[in-house]
Amino acid sequence: ANEQYGKIYAKFANMPIEEVAKDPQAQRIGKNMFDTYCIQCHGSDAKGSKGFPNLTDGDWLWGGSPEQIHETIAKGRIAIMAPWGPALGEERVKDVANYVMSFSKPAGQYDEERAARGNAIFHGPPANCFTCHGDKGQGVLGLGPNLTDDVWLWCGTQKAIIETITNGRHNQ
């Protein structure tokens, strides 16, 4: 492979990523590589699917700079959210789910009493959700996604949020 492709890739090795992105040959190579290695999960339109992020929006858990994207492609990303169902129990999981929904859903789409109880759980032990998701749910780069927008890797329904809190998530 090195004999066959080494000369082609050498052209881009020391070129700034911004220049590589504008190069027509690099664009063709990139499209071929995306179609070979990425399309299965992220889709032909790169808009993702359940469990696989949309690559066309501005919501990047690991950062959206060219260098951060390069690192993600080169090294991959493994993210784990611990399951909180056993520690919290069903009712407190529902409280936290309603609090999370209060960040991005209009009143009436979540239970305000449960959300008020969920606030205390989100910001305190044992869960301390804010350490990964930020004090106001805005997310912490590389730790936990933004919960205040309408971008949900695993779907933003109450059922899906409860499932995520209860069972955790393992993204690779």
Spans of features found by a protein language model:
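A general structural signal for well-ordered secondary-structure junctions
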Residues: 61, 78-79, 106, 127-129, ...
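Electron-transfer interface patches adjacent to heme c in soluble/periplasmic c-type cytochromes
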Residues: 58-66, 83-93, 126-128, 146-163
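Periplasmic c-type cytochrome electron-transfer domains
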Residues: 1-22, 62-68, 83-101
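Sequence/structural segment immediately N-terminal to covalent heme-attachment motifs in c-type
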Residues: 22-44, 71, 110-138, 149, ...
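Membrane-embedded segments
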Residues: 26-68, 74-78
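Short, flexible helix-adjacent loops and helix caps
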Residues: 17, 46, 60, 105-108, ...
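Axial heme c-ligation environment in periplasmic c-type cytochrome domains
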Residues: 50-56, 74-93, 97-111, 142-146, ...
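Short charge-dense sequence patches
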Residues: 15-24, 46-51, 146
